[in-house]
Structures are given as structure tokens and as C-alpha cells.
């Protein structure tokens, strides 16, 4: 095994660490959809979940291993496991269908974690790590070990732990900045120290994992690459615990745009034009939108690479410069991440073949049933909107691949409001038993009245904690996208919907979020979680 390749391995943990963002809970089908997108994107490793955490996570990892990871050229499918036999056995079982499976096991090494969380001594950790790595190795050849909170661990102790993990069979050692505490110079020095002081480090790939609590995760990772790290653990849109993880799109495009700078650190001539990762950058924007839609986590407009303003210029001086030559104020081409202004316009006279053809050109792969349903939505939208653009098509497709079970189905929405009127809303909803129930309510505004009317029918307790609207397209008949976040029993549930009518989009998003909550309540009754992580 080449433990110092001349390229960077991209390890995506959107489906594991990214899903730990409040409100980002995904069902099995949604995880499968994202895993397929990650494979298209070209990631080397997909960390599909934490199999022992819950039956749902086990099923998701197993299904991803059997579908996305079943071929010889598929990405490596990875499952997380604590350094216990039960966790490791669950991961091995879930990963069995994968052609290239990996177990990722971890144990904390910082004194604060040892004292307050694990209540173990350093000597105990030095004994547990090789034992559990060897146990994982008894199932699979590919084993990754992480010393949790390495960024705050004593370096000398860390060197000992890593040496024992590698001796026991770890093929990758991952160095996590678990709480986003280190600075780039410190993190680079930590990686350099590991390269210089772990005797058998040449037998494993050095990986890094980091959180963005101080906004330094990407900078830390790039410094780590310069000092010998060859695997980067990251997420789409940087989602994850607290302030999130290092952002995949920012890391990949930094390595892409500044290739001549990073080439020598990977043993290449500065002028080499070979990509530093296997990522198909033209899939970045579409993957970002998919993850945002399915998790309900909005990408901030000024987010690097994939934000709505990333390639926008408002200053007259900047606009003039860009019109004369793009490189005056743009360091990368929007088309390099799959964002194009080449908007093919469809209308109400466009047929199924034109619709199918444009979806294929945009890279969407739909089943015949999904295509039929999406075409019906397209025709309905075309009757209300003069022109249908690529952004509209994207919204239609994302609605169709939103796999939340339709237990409660919105059949009718009517709202009355005005400057001298009490906002009222009437709704009709089909319930899980097939009956149609109608009710009405008044509120402080049309959306408030709408949510109250829906609550009277559905009767699922919740707290609406976030409501946002953004335009998908331009013009007076623009498609509007509503994102709603609910909270119940300490957990957050998100959903989104798009429509030319914001009230209709609001109703659909709210019902979709309630469906997510309803499914979660049903699953909790049937199969309580195996452990709390």
C-alpha cells in the first residue's frame, strides 16, 4: 500500500458526522440518494454511518454497502465504531455487502476526555487501542483508527497510541481536531511531529478530521496536507456538529485552484496539471443543492464556492472588470463546479421527451415512476409560469426525490388575508387511515393561520423554530422555496418545498416536516435506539 500518494484522498462523512447537525436527520432512502451522489462526485471513501448507534443507521450502512459500494470500482464504504467489540462487530456485519469495506474505530486520548468521559488511565488506553484495532482487523483488512480529541492530546502520548494502532493493523490513522481548537500552524506541526516521531508511520496513511468552531478547519487541513496528511475527512456544505466540519467543496477547490502551490508538497512538479483529487468538480454544485434540500439546511448566500453570491458582483468596478475579463475578480469559473447560466427554457408546450432529455443533460437519474410524477409537476407549473428554467427543473426533481413518507397528505389550502382582515386558513388533509379531514384557523398572519389549521387536523405536538423563504428563480412569477424546522423532545426536524405560491409551499413544507416527526415517533415506539451517541 502506498502510504504517501501524490494525491489527496477525499473521505466524506456527510452521512455520519454531517447528519449530527441539529435538524439534519435523514431516513434510509435519503441517505442512499446522497450516497449515490457522492459516488458520482468521485469521493474515495463514504462514511455511511454508525451501525451500532441504531437499527436505522445499521440498515443505512448495509444498503449503501450493497448498492453504492458493491462494485470493484465503487468508493470505499466505511462504518464508524467505538473501540468496543459490540460496535466493531456491528460495523463489520453492516459492511459485509461492500466490495471495499472499512471499519473506522476510535478512542479518546486527551486528558480531559480520559478523566471526565472515559474515566480511564493512559495505560488502559495503550492496552485497549491495539486490542480493538486487531479485533477490527480480524474482520477486514482496511481499518482506520482515530485518537479522539487528538488536537488537545499530549503529543508524546499520542505518538505511542498511534504506533500501537499501526502495529496492530491500522492502515489509516486519523488525527481529529474534535473541538476545532487548533490553529493552522499548530495543526501542521502536530502532523509533522507524527511523521517524525511515530516509528512505523510509513505503514499507514495520515488522515485529518476537524471541526470549524473557530472557522479554521479548512485552513488547518491545507496546512496538514503540506506536512504529510493524505486523507481529508470532510462534509458537503461543511455541515456537522456545532459549527460544522471542514467543507469538502472548499478543500477540493482550494487544491484545484492553487494546484501549482500544493504540487511540490505532494512530490509533483509545480507545473503539473494533474488533479490533486479524484473529485469531478462539475458535480459539486448539484451535490451541494441535494444535501441542502434533503437535510433542510440552507447554504448561506456568502458561503465560499456554493453560496448564491459566490460568483455574484454588485460593485460597478467589479462588474466592469469581470465583463472585460473574468479573471479580474474571479479566481475560478462557475462552470467548474457545475454552475451554468446556460438556461434552456421549457414551456407548457414542451413534451415528455424534451423534459426527459433536459433532466439527463442536467445529470439527473430518475426512475420511470419518478419521471412521470416529475413531469406532472412540470406541466402544472408550466400552466402557472411562462417559462421553466433549469433552476425550476432542479426544484421539481428535488421535490420528487424527497423520500419522506406521505402519511399526511395536503389536499387543499385556502387562505384569506388583508390589511383590514383577520388572516384565516382552511386546509383539507388526507390522514394515514385514508380519510379526509378539514379544519380552519385564524392567526397573526397567513402562515401562522395555516400552521394552526394543519395542527388542528394532524395533532402532532411540536414547536416551529424556523421559517425561511428564498427565491429559486427570478421574475414576478419566480419559484419560492420554503424551509421549515420543527422541534420536539429535544430533536429538530426539517423539510422544504417549492412552489410559485409561497402559501402552498409553506403548507407543503410544514406537512412534510410533520411527516418526518410522525415517522420518528413511530420508529421510537417500534425500535428504541440501541444507544445514545
Curated annotation (Swiss-Prot):
Cofactor needs: Mn(2+)
CC per GO annotation: cytoplasm
Matches recorded under SUPFAM superfamilies: 2-isopropylmalate synthase LeuA, allosteric (dimerisation) domain, Aldolase
Residues annotated for Mn(2+) binding in this entry: 17, 209, 211, 245
Keywords carried by this UniProt record: Amino-acid biosynthesis, Branched-chain amino acid biosynthesis, Cytoplasm, Leucine biosynthesis, Manganese, Metal-binding, Transferase
InterPro entries, sorted: 2-IPM_HCS-like, 2-isopropylmalate_synth_dimer, AIPM/Hcit_synth_CS, Aldolase_TIM, LeuA/HCS_post-cat, LeuA_allosteric_dom_sf, LeuA_bact_synth, PYR_CT
Pfam families cross-referenced by the UniProt entry: HCS_D2, HMGL-like, LeuA_dimer
Listed pathway(s): Amino-acid biosynthesis; L-leucine biosynthesis; L-leucine from 3-methyl-2-oxobutanoate: step 1/4
Annotated segments matching region Regulatory domain: 409-533
Main localization of the protein described in the UniProt heading: cytoplasm
SMART domains: LeuA_dimer
Reactions the enzyme catalyzes: 3-methyl-2-oxobutanoate + acetyl-CoA + H2O = (2S)-2-isopropylmalate + CoA + H(+)
GO terms under biological process: L-leucine biosynthetic process
Quaternary structure and partners: Homodimer.
Family: Belongs to the alpha-IPM synthase/homocitrate synthase family. LeuA type 1 subfamily.
NCBIfam families noted in UniProt: leuA_bact (TIGR00973), PRK00915.1-3 (NF002086)
HAMAP family, per the entry: LeuA_type1
Function according to Swiss-Prot or TrEMBL: Catalyzes the condensation of the acetyl group of acetyl-CoA with 3-methyl-2-oxobutanoate (2-ketoisovalerate) to form 3-carboxy-3-hydroxy-4-methylpentanoate (2-isopropylmalate).
Protein name: 2-isopropylmalate synthase
Organism listed in the record: Microcystis aeruginosa
Amino acid at each position: 500500500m502506498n502510504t504517501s500518494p501524490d494525491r489527496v484522498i477525499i473521505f466524506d462523512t456527510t452521512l455520519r458526522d454531517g447528519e449530527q447537525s441539529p435538524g439534519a436527520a435523514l431516513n434510509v432512502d435519503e441517505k442512499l440518494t446522497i450516497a449515490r451522489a457522492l459516488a458520482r462526485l468521485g469521493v474515495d471513501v463514504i462514511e455511511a454511518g454508525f451501525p451500532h448507534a441504531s437499527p436505522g443507521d445499521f440498515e443505512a450502512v448495509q444498503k449503501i454497502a450493497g448498492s453504492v459500494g458493491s462494485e470493484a470500482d465503487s468508493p470505499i464504504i466505511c462504518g464508524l465504531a467505538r473501540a468496543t467489540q459490540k460496535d466493531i462487530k456491528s460495523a463489520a456485519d453492516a459492511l459485509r455487502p461492500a466490495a471495499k469495506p472499512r471499519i473506522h474505530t476510535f478512542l479518546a486520548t486527551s486528558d480531559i476526555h480520559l478523566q471526565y468521559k472515559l474515566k480511564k488511565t493512559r495505560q488502559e488506553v495503550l492496552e485497549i487501542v491495539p486490542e480493538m484495532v486487531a479485533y477490527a482487523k480480524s474482520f477486514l483488512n482496511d481499518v482506520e483508527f482515530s485518537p479522539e480529541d487528538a488536537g488537545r492530546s499530549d503529543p508524546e502520548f499520542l505518538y505511542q497510541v498511534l504506533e500501537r494502532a499501526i502495529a496492530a493493523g491500522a492502515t489509516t490513522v486519523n488525527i481529529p481536531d474534535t473541538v476545532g481548537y487548533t490553529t493552522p500552524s499548530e495543526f501542521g506541526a502536530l502532523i509533522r511531529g507524527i511523521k517524525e516521531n511515530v516509528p512505523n508511520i510509513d505503514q499507514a496513511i495520515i488522515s485529518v478530521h476537524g471541526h470549524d468552531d473557530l472557522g479554521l478547519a479548512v485552513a488547518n487541513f491545507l496546512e496538514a496536507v503540506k506536512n504529510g496528511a493524505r486523507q481529508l475527512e470532510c462534509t458537503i456544505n461543511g455541515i456537522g456538529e456545532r459549527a460544522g466540519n471542514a467543507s469538502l467543496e472548499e478543500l477540493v477547490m482550494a487544491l484545484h485552484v492553487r494546484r501549482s502551490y500544493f504540487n511540490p508538497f505532494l512530490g509533483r512538479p509545480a507545473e503539473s496539471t494533474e488533479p490533486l483529487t479524484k473529485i469531478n468538480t462539475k458535480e459539486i454544485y448539484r451535490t451541494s443543492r441535494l444535501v441542502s434540500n434533503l437535510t433542510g439546511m440552507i447554504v448561506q448566500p456568502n458561503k465560499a464556492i456554493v453560496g448564491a453570491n459566490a460568483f455574484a458582483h454588485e460593485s460597478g468596478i467589479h462588474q466592469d472588470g469581470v465583463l472585460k475579463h473574468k479573471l479580474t475578480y474571479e479566481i475560478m469559473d462557475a462552470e467548474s463546479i457545475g454552475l451554468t447560466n446556460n438556461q434552456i427554457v421549457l414551456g407548457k408546450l414542451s413534451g415528455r421527451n424534451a423534459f426527459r432529455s433536459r433532466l439527463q443533460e442536467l445529470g439527473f437519474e430518475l426512475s420511470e415512476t419518478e419521471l412521470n410524477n416529475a413531469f406532472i409537476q412540470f406541466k402544472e407549473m408550466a400552466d402557472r409560469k411562462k417559462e421553466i428554467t433549469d433552476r425550476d427543473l432542479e426544484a421539481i426533481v428535488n421535490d420528487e426525490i424527497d423520500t419522506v413518507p406521505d402519511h399526511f397528505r395536503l389536499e387543499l389550502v385556502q387562505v384569506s388575508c388583508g390589511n383590514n382582515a383577520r388572516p384565516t386558513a382552511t386546509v383539507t388533509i388526507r390522514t394515514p387511515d385514508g380519510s379526509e379531514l378539514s379544519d380552519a384557523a385564524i392567526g397573526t398572519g397567513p402562515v401562522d393561520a395555516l400552521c394552526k389549521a394543519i395542527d388542528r387536523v394532524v395533532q402532532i405536538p411540536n414547536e416551529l423554530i424556523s421559517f425561511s423563504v428564498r427565491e429559486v428563480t427570478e421574475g414576478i412569477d419566480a419559484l419560492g422555496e420554503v424551509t421549515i424546522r420543527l422541534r420536539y423532545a429535544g430533536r429538530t426536524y426539517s423539510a422544504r418545498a417549492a412552489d410559485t405560491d409561497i402559501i402552498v409551499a409553506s403548507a407543503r413544507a410544514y406537512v412534510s416536516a410533520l411527516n418526518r416527526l410522525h415517522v420518528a415517533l413511530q420508529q421510537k415506539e417500534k425500535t428504541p435506539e440501541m444507544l445514545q451517541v
